[in-house]
Amino acid sequence: SSLAFVSNPDIPNIPTQLGATHAGNPGANSAAGTMQHLAFKVKDHTELMAMRDRLRSKGVPVLGPLDHGMCVSMYFAGLENLSLELSYSAEPINNELWIDPEVVELAGISAEELAGYKNPNTFSDSHGSIGQPAINNSTGPHMTNYPPGVYEKSMQIPDEIALNMVESKPPVSP
């Protein structure tokens, strides 16, 4: 898989507020809908240490490794106040040991919901045949901050047309 950090010329003009727009560290808060921190999985302790050395060799301070019991992690800052984590687990996380009943109660999660989280329904790949849900009746999260009507129109574009709507050639030719 890939991860892209996208920027545009207007982003530097948007104020950053630690504790609201960004956490700034892996233990601090940020507003709902923002990214508190992003964790990347590495294979094992050897790979974790290799990544730590690689980061430190580039002048990036790294906290850890820290053994959390369910995983071993290390934390560092990314560009633009992103808080990043690298971690591995030697064994699958035992949800009977690591799901705190007090937190479940405080979050208002019912026994039925919890069972669904612990054992989600299996998903059968439909090989791209599932259509777009009706935007006005969809229960899933929605993208926002579009001019009025643009999101609704965009979500009505057939997939086969959307596939070729954007520039797909690299900026440099061989």
Residue ranges and their predicted role:
Residues 1-61, 77-174:
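Glyoxalase I/VOC metalloenzyme domain signal
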